[in-house]
Amino acid sequence: LSDIPELEEAHLLDALRTVAQQRPIYMTYDCQYRVYGAYKDAGYTSETLTLLFCMRNVLAGTASVIGGRIVSGKNGFAGMTGYMPWGMSQEEQIQVIAQGSPKGLELIVKTALSVIAVLNPDELLFAGNVVDREMMEAVQTACAKAVPPEFLPKLRLADHRGDQYSLEGMYQKALEMKADLAIEYWQ
């Protein structure tokens, strides 16, 4: 599954496994690396963190870490909020979010409220190049109107687009896989 039409039918994991031979491979939805990096960066160990990633020209998406574990679902689809029934096509979602229009803000707020209602995370982190400080204030106001204060998570705008978190998430996952291999080797 890809936002890049040319990769939609590509079987990247199979191709990588062929090239890597017996080496372990971990491939996941990019937002899952971002949220994992943000989780580790925050020093969390048992908390729930959800990242809402809004980047121009791609579907908005979320990813969550609960108690140190990435929530990926049955086959990595967890967090793909662009597939929810928002009453508009995926192309329309991409357009309204990229434009920063009132409809785009409404879609971002609905996504945030859905995450809050389903997961009730400790923190909801916004990253990407769409949500700025002004939009973040509007999101916070809308969420505060809809959710009682005792159920509202900390809502925070990332200091950067989230790219640093992505690299940190990949690094942390690689370290864990290396440790798992060492344990497996010595057993």
Predicted features along the sequence, with ranges:
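Phosphate-binding/catalytic loop of phosphoryl-transfer enzymes
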Residues: 1-88, 184-185
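ATP-binding/phosphotransfer module of carbohydrate and carboxylate kinases, centering on a glycine-rich
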Residues: 13, 17-23, 41-43, 88-187
